[in-house]
């Protein structure tokens, strides 16, 4: 078992910002654990621009922003391919590392685990289980990291801002956005979001519309929706479930840390301390979802 001054779980904007600030303050024994093979968090998957202005005074694509964050944290011990399994008292963290299962201890531990979208299964959408159903994050990984085009015509379920990230990803990959589906009377993204989706991307925006079922054998062939009592099957070969973010609390909920029922993340005080004062939390783990610059600022 090894002990460090500070242990940070998550190498996204919040985790890397904290590492950079600790380095600036002269705290050298800082270790960052990241389950993916590369540091940078969700922005690595976002090939479009819109990142970095508040942090670096540059408008950057997601990968460029992630690269800048990692560069700023140069000299920090960032251990990729390492997954935290359990949080224990006194800053002990069990993790799967390239060497096997280890216990790594931090005199202080920062949880910067981020957030995730709600997938099809958690939304209780019926129908078949064909290939071609994604979250925005999965779509972006396939397009920007795997460099594949997973479908040609897609429907986006949800109209939060992240849905527009899906639209930009589709444009990059040459995927036709057929429609955007929203259950409420108006889309969630601020105006003129609906106009942009229709006019700039050519997508139908269907408000007051409920997803009924997914059709297809082997591969998606359509999405059945209901609007004003009438049902329609929208022909498509891809469905993207976007938004409805929830904190990434898979290892927090089974732990000894208290959970805030209002946010789903850990309870913190005004200093970001959890119910066990050895642990702190920052970023989108606390109340999804905020922009990357907010997570960066909280980490610092």
Task: Map each language-model feature to its residues.
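FAD-binding core/adjacent interface of flavoenzyme oxidoreductases
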Residues: 1-9, 65-153, 224-231, 240, ...
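Beta1-alpha1 glycine-rich phosphate/pyrophosphate-binding loop at the start
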Residues: 4-64, 68, 141, 151-194, ...
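Short glycine/serine/threonine-rich phosphate/pyrophosphate-binding segments
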Residues: 15-18, 119, 136-139, 162-167, ...
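General beta-strand structural signal in soluble alpha/beta enzymes
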Residues: 32-35, 78-80, 104-105, 111-113, ...
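Hydrophobic alpha-helical scaffolding
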Residues: 56-63, 237-242, 289-293
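A Rossmann-like FAD-binding core segment of flavoenzymes
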Residues: 70-73, 78-95, 171-253, 258
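FAD-site-proximal beta/loop scaffold in flavoenzymes
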Residues: 133-143, 238-289
């Amino acid at each position: 078992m090894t002990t460090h001054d500070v242990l940070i779980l998550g190498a996204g904007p919040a985790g890397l910002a904290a590492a950079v600030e600790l380095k600036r303050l002269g705290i050298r024994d800082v270790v960052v654990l990241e389950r993916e093979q590369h540091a940078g968090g969700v922005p690595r998957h976002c090939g479009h621009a819109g990142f970095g202005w508040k942090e670096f005074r540059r408008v950057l694509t997601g990968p460029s922003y992630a690269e800048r964050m990692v560069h700023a944290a140069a000299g920090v011990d960032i251990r990729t391919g390492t997954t935290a399994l359990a949080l224990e008292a006194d800053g002990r963290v069990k993790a799967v590392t390239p060497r096997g299962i280890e216990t790594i201890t931090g005199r202080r531990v920062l949880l910067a685990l981020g957030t995730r979208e709600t997938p099809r299964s958690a939304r209780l959408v019926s129908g078949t289980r064909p290939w071609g159903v994604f979250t925005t994050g999965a779509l972006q990984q396939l397009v920007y990291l795997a460099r594949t085009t997973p479908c040609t015509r897609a429907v986006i379920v949800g109209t939060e801002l992240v849905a527009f990230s899906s639209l930009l990803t589709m444009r990059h990959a040459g995927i036709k956005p057929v429609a955007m589906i929203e259950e409420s009377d108006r889309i969630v993204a601020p105006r003129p979001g609906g106009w942009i989706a229709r006019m700039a991307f050519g997508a139908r925006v269907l408000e007051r519309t409920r997803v009924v079922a997914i059709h297809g054998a082997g591969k998606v062939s359509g999405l059945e929706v209901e609007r004003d009592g009438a049902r329609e099957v929208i022909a498509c070969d891809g469905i993207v479930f976007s938004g409805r973010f929830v904190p990434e609390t898979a290892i927090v909920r089974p732990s000894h840390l208290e959970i805030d029922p209002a946010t789903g993340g850990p309870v913190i005080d005004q200093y970001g301390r959890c119910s066990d004062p050895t642990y702190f939390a920052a970023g989108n783990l606390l109340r999804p979802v905020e922009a990357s610059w907010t997570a960066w600022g909280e980490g610092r």
